Amino acid sequence: MNKSFFVTGTDTEVGKTVASMAVMQAVSKAGYSVAGYKPVAAGSKETEQGPMNSDAIRLRECTTVEVSYTDVNPCLLHAACSPHIAAELENETVDFSLLTDGLKNLQARSEFTLVEGAGGWRVPVTYDTTLADWVVGEKLPVILVVGVKLGCLNHAYLTAEAIRRDGMEIVGWVANRVNPGTEHYGDIVKTLEHHLKVPKLGEIPYMPSIKSRDLSGYIDIAPLGL
């Protein structure tokens, strides 16, 4: 039996990977086998094993079953820009069937699969399609990550509205403090709790570096039915 969820954010650079790591670590501590999946990544760096995406590397590090890099990230685009632009620059096509095959592979090998998106909910993967179109097709429940900063309320409201308009369920959300100097942090979180009306899975404090950190204590996985 596998449970799978999709992690999206209110924008790029709001902490989707940090939140994904925290959820995966918490689920693993609860005794489940866990796999992380970054179906589409834009932006790579050279490693001894070839080009890789740093977010996908972190998800692989939190994965508790044996996987290759391409198992975690089947579609790697090298330019650090919107996936549809990167794909055009590199003469590539984001193939939804490839993404689905990769998801099924991980679902068959783990009890819990966490899929991390690229950018926000409406990030385009071609000029006519978005990654959300694939998520809707896969019927993946959504975890929303809010990067708590000035302006995040509008971003969170609009993102939640778009997800629900697409017929998808938001099962929980995570507050990630991306700016330690954000004023009225508590009031912002309180407002989000009131408006989103779904369980808050946790709050992640500002962290300059997350390498080798155990983030599981910041997340409550009970709302995920585990």
Language-model features: locations:
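N-terminal phosphate/diphosphate-binding loop that engages ATP/GTP or pyrophosphate donors
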Residues: 4, 18-93, 102-105
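C-terminal lobe/tail of nucleotide-utilizing enzymes
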Residues: 160-226
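Conserved glycine(s) of the Walker
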Residues: 14-15
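Hydrophobic anchor at the beta1->P-loop junction of P-loop NTPases
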Residues: 7
